[in-house]
């Protein structure tokens, strides 16, 4: 796992997804060296960088050109990227041109979540996996409901990570924002 502190970050681009959350996403995805992964809403590229080390191909999509730039910088910093394609476009537009995917991770949908999930469903390989991360309650509900309509059996977990800061007289736990991880396998 890459260390959160090693990522290049900017104020204008969210991320990276915290290390513990990336670890859960990797576990839930059951990624193999033969998998083709799509990362929708790549932000600073935390998910992209982790999958680039483990999958055959990663396609990373973001509407924000700064996000694509920071993701590229992080890939270069970690000597990754030979198997990564970066696309600066909306998720729904970019996904229409991708024909093969085993794993789709949606970390940012730009209010297009239902459309994005429909397109992913139509292109996801048999036994493919979908993972949606969400901090907004509305996004969690929207993802669950849409996946159910698409005949998936989604599972949801909400993760609250706290990290300790060592002080002179003890350890203080500092909480991160809770995040939901919604996962579903194609039947």
From Swiss-Prot:
Protein's name according to its UniProt entry: Probable cobalt-precorrin-6B C(15)-methyltransferase (decarboxylating)
A GO BP annotation: anaerobic cobalamin biosynthetic process
Organism: Methanobrevibacter smithii (strain ATCC 35061 / DSM 861 / OCM 144 / PS)
Protein EC: 2.1.1.196
One GO MF term attached to the UniProt entry: protein methyltransferase activity
Gene that encodes the chain: cbiT
Cross-referenced NCBIfam families: CbiT
Pathway(s) it belongs to: Cofactor biosynthesis; adenosylcobalamin biosynthesis; cob(II)yrinate a,c-diamide from sirohydrochlorin (anaerobic route): step 8/10
Family to which the UniProt record says this protein belongs: Belongs to the methyltransferase superfamily. Archaeal-type CbiT family.
Known catalytic reactions: Co-precorrin-6B + S-adenosyl-L-methionine = Co-precorrin-7 + S-adenosyl-L-homocysteine + CO2
InterPro entries: CbiT, Cbl_synth_MTase_CbiT, Cobalamin_biosynth_MTase, Methyltranfer_dom, SAM-dependent_MTases_sf
Gene3D superfamilies in UniProt: Vaccinia Virus protein VP39 (3.40.50.150)
Pfam family for this entry, one: Methyltransf_31
CDD domains, alphabetized: AdoMet_MTases (cd02440)
Taxonomy, superkingdom: Archaea
Residues binding S-adenosyl-L-methionine: 17, 41-45, 62, 91
SUPFAM superfamilies: S-adenosyl-L-methionine-dependent methyltransferases
Keyword annotations of the record: Cobalamin biosynthesis, Methyltransferase, S-adenosyl-L-methionine, Transferase
Keyword Transferase: yes
């Amino acid at each position: 796992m890459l260390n959160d502190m090693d990522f290049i970050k900017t104020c204008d681009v969210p991320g990276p997804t915290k290390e513990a959350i990336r670890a859960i996403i990797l576990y839930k995805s059951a990624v193999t060296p033969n998998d083709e992964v799509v990362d929708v809403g790549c932000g600073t590229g935390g998910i992209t960088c982790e999958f680039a080390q483990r999958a055959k191909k990663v396609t990373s999509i973001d509407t924000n050109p700064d996000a694509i730039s920071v993701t590229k910088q992080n890939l270069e910093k970690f000597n990754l990227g030979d198997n990564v394609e970066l696309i600066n476009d909306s998720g729904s537009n970019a996904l229409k041109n991708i024909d093969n995917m085993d794993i789709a991770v949606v970390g940012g949908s730009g209010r297009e979540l239902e459309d994005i999930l429909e397109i992913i469903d139509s292109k996801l390989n048999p036994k493919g996996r979908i993972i949606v991360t969400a901090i907004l309650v509305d996004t969690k509900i929207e993802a669950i409901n849409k996946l159910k309509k698409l005949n998936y059996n989604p599972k949801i977990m909400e993760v609250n990570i706290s990290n300790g800061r060592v002080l002179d007289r003890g350890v203080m736990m500092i909480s991160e924002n809770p995040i939901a991880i919604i996962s579903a396998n194609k039947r």
